[in-house]
UniProtKB/Swiss-Prot annotation:
Ranges in coiled-coil conformation: none
Name the record gives this protein: Lysosome membrane protein 2-A
Top-rank taxon: Eukaryota
Family label: Belongs to the CD36 family.
Protein source organism: Dictyostelium discoideum
GO cellular component assignments: early phagosome; lysosomal membrane; lysosome; macropinosome; pathogen-containing vacuole; phagocytic vesicle; phagolysosome; vesicle membrane
Intervals of motif Tyrosine-type lysosomal sorting signal: 771-774
InterPro entries in the cross-refs: CD36_fam (IPR002159), Tumour_necrosis_fac-like_dom (IPR008983)
Keyword Iron-sulfur: no
The keyword Glycoprotein belongs to this UniProt entry's keyword annotation: yes
Membrane topology: Multi-pass membrane protein
């Protein structure tokens, strides 16, 4: 789906649904990045200034600029991993049973980012950047192949459609939202109609319908010029490879002239006479049976070909030659211009619209009346006037074919009523009758078109098609590969409605709006504090303005913290709000001393500001235009009446859901973290979405369904960890000794340095340590 800023609001019906990444472009796309930026750098000073110089990025010439701008995400391993919630009893669930879920995973991806359009303001105190992100599947680290593992769950795309249609359905005598979906699906049905009516197959059927009359006229003209010599006519029609010397009007009337080998067809005069005897039911001029036989032969039907070869004494090659002449020579010379004239169109490309709004292309006959093979329309007329005629209403639209194509039925136009958004806009125009002028249609035409699309097609075409899509693709419940769920989903119902939006839960290779942070140049305590999130300093999507505050999720915190704070505020981009981390105690990451923080309990409390009515659920419904709720894993901290009482499979333990962070206070680097969030979808309370005979009639409202677990972590390379460990040990032991010398000089000087240390240790240990060596940092 199209990514939006958190304060963006759009009209429910004007954007279709919105479905799936679409719906969840923010969720999971933001990683809590480890700050590994200092890992590749050897210590070059033993002062606090060295640490500051390595941490602070206030210009493009800063020591660590390239790492900060994205290089570190390539050299180290940043991981986003997923567990899918799989519904194991979908059929029983649809029949009213409690849903049973299992988790499937992990599916591991390497995450890389890049900062572009970087500018520094306020003398380097502020940095603005645009961040792009990409995910790379790690097959060697994933026990499951996302292309092969199939997952069944609630369909975000369909859920979004229901959610967005429900308010309007309530205004229509409290109509179930699904019924409104079926009515509006007339847009997709009309597009299917016009796709067929604009196909070569339909054009050929028009030629089979119009050619006989035009052929008879030209035949009589030639025969008149031959003084009635019928025998000569058939001889020339069958075998002449160039214009005959006798008679006039032969152009387009010679079957052998279209033979690329310049050879005669050798069709006998007897066969020619049978072919053009309209009373013969096998004749190409016979509109009762013959034309159907020839259409089916064109479509490759062996039975029809056998009948024609037998009854007309023709070979298969001769039948092919006749069809080639009839459709590609005679039709181009005589029929195409005639059809353009009766349809009042500039060329044959508008032939389908002509038939759809007038029926003239088939002389007032519906395509549904033809009985050829693969006939797609057996539920009655599809043309607007002919459908009304079939129910006893005489309707003749006043809009011209060309204007109808331009204003209503041009699929490449986003305002076309062949897609959901366009049809909704057309319906909205009915609130003020004058606005139909923008479509250049009269009120009468508009009402008839609306009635046709939403009411007259409802039972015969719209409903069967939607139910067929349920069966083929799924509706509320779908089964897709994990790769489709994450990245590449295309929803069959969205496609049918002409909604050109992806339905995946994630987006790859995204580019965010610009954000601005404090660099820490003027105040170390402000290092990496967010100033502006995607062009907003205040989040207006909530009840009242919420100030953007907290450290960004880059893993870099203020350096040189001799007394680490008891709490830290992070701006959590996944849920678009500040969250709190609380100091727990000492910890170690691969031998390096760190401070362990945890996400505080009750991180998503009831809040009118953040529109949270159920503890544990971060409600993003208004932001995503979809009933979506973010929680910790397994809906931890969500009351049982909204979680474990309604489904099976949750593991609601603190060990499963805890979010730790290990902070190295000297450099301000987070050396470890494991962020765990979960996407959940819901059918809102008091929803009137489904009728009593719907496939989904047993779905309960105000029930929350787990969809996807998202984990985010990172790992520094072992060489960087080894370097970091060794340098910290030297710092602790040597104090004022210029460690940088040891790091730069070769093995001999290293041994000498260590000897000097042993000799002077008693004196040196009384001295105060002053310098720290630059270590890993990641932005």
């Amino acid at each position: 789906m199209v990514k939006r800023g958190c304060c963006h609001r759009k009209m429910v019906n004007h954007k279709g649904c919105l479905v799936s990444g679409i719906f969840l472009a923010v969720i999971g796309a933001v990683l809590f990045i480890l700050a590994f930026a200092l890992l590749p750098h050897l210590i070059n000073q033993t002062t606090q200034n060295a640490v500051i110089q390595a941490v602070i990025v206030d210009s493009t010439s800063s020591q660590r600029y390239n790492d900060w701008a994205g290089q570190q995400s390539i050299e180290n391993y940043y991981q986003q991993y997923f567990y899918a919630w799989n519904l194991t009893n979908p059929n029983e669930f649809l029949n009213g049973s409690i849903p049973i879920f299992e988790t499937v995973g992990p599916f591991n991806y390497k995450y890389e980012f890049n900062f572009s359009n970087v500018t520094f303001q306020d003398g380097g105190n502020l940095a603005t950047y645009t961040q792009s992100k990409s995910f790379i599947y790690q097959s060697d680290m994933s026990p499951n192949d996302p292309n092969e593992i199939m997952i069944t769950n609630i369909n975000p795309a369909y859920l979004g459609l229901m959610f967005q249609l429900a308010p309007n359905a309530e205004l229509l005598d409290n109509m179930p939202a699904e019924n409104l979906l079926i009515a509006l699906s007339g847009c997709g049905q009309m597009r299917l109609f016009l796709e067929y009516l604009s196909s070569d197959n339909f054009t050929n059927i028009v030629y089979f319908t119009q050619n006989p009359k035009l052929y008879q006229e030209q035949y009589l003209n030639i025969l008149k010029s031959l003084n009635g010599d019928e025998q000569y006519f058939y001889q020339q029609w069958a075998n002449a490879t160039s214009i005959p010397q006798k008679g006039n009007g032969w152009y387009g009337m010679l079957v052998s002239s279209v033979n690329n080998n310049n050879e005669s067809s050798n069709i006998s005069i007897l066969s020619a006479k049978l072919l053009f005897n309209s009373s013969n039911e096998n004749s190409i001029l016979n509109q009762e049976i013959g034309s159907t036989l020839w259409i089916n032969a064109l479509l490759g039907d062996k039975t029809s070909i056998t009948v024609l070869t037998s009854e007309l004494q023709l070979t298969v090659d001769q039948i092919d030659m006749i069809l080639n002449w009839w459709l590609n020579d005679f039709s181009k010379v005589y029929t195409e211009s005639y059809v353009n004239e009766i349809c009042d169109i500039p060329d044959i490309s508008m032939l389908g619209v002509c038939q759809f709004v007038t029926g003239n292309a088939l002389n007032g006959r519906s395509i549904s009346n033809y009985t050829f093979l693969t006939q797609p329309f057996d539920q009655g007329p599809i043309e607007i006037p002919l459908l009304y005629q079939s129910i006893g209403i005489d309707v003749k639209l006043s809009v011209s074919v060309q204007q109808a194509y331009k204003s209503l039925f041009n699929e490449s136009d986003s305002n076309s009523i062949l897609n959901l958004n366009g049809l909704v806009n057309f319906l909205t125009a009915s609130k003020s009758f004058d606005t139909f002028k923008q479509y250049n249609v009269t009120l009468f035409d508009a009402i008839k078109i609306i009635g046709y699309a939403t009411a007259e097609l409802y039972e015969q075409y719209n409903k069967p098609t939607i139910l067929g899509l349920y069966e083929k693709y799924g509706g509320l419940i779908v089964t897709r590969s994990m790769d489709d769920w994450l990245w590449n989903c295309q929803d069959g119902i969205l496609d049918y409605l002409g909604v050109d939006q992806p339905c995946a839960l994630q987006q790859n290779n995204t580019v965010n709006k610009p954000s601005t942070i404090f660099t820490g140049q003027q105040d170390l305590s402000m290092t990496n504090q967010i100033f502006e999130f995607q062009e907003q300093t205040f989040l207006t999507c909530w009840n009242g303005s919420v100030q953007v505050e907290g450290f960004t999720e880059s893993g870099q915190f203020p350096p040189l913290q001799s007394d680490p704070p008891q709490t830290m505020t992070l701006f959590e981009e996944n849920v678009i709000r500040p969250v709190q981390l609380e100091l727990s105690g000492d910890s170690q990451v691969q031998g390096i001393d760190t401070k362990r923080y945890y996400l505080v309990n009750n991180s998503f409390p009831i809040s009118t500001t953040f529109k949270t009515t159920i503890p544990g659920f971060a409600n993003l419904t208004d932001i995503q235009n979809l009933p979506i709720y973010v929680s910790l894993w397994d809906m931890y901290e969500v009351p049982p009446q909204y979680s474990s009482n309604n489904l099976q499979g949750l593991n609601q333990t603190y060990q499963s859901a805890q979010v730790p962070l290990d902070l190295e206070p000297i450099t301000g680097n987070a050396l470890y973290y494991n962020l765990k969030l979960q996407i959940n979808l819901a059918i809102p309370e008091f929803s009137n979405w489904f009728s009593s005979n719907s496939t989904f009639k047993n779905m309960k409202s105000n029930v929350f369904y787990p969809i996807l677990k998202i984990g985010q972590t990172a790992t520094p390379s072992q060489s960087n960890i080894d370097l970091l460990n060794s340098q910290f040990k030297l710092i602790k032991i040597l104090g004022f000794v210029p460690v940088i010398v040891v790091s730069i000089i070769g093995g001999i000087i290293l041994i000498a340095g260590i000897s000097m240390f042993a000799f002077g240790f008693k004196k040196l240990r009384q001295q105060k340590q002053q310098g720290y060596q630059a270590i890993i940092n990641n932005e």
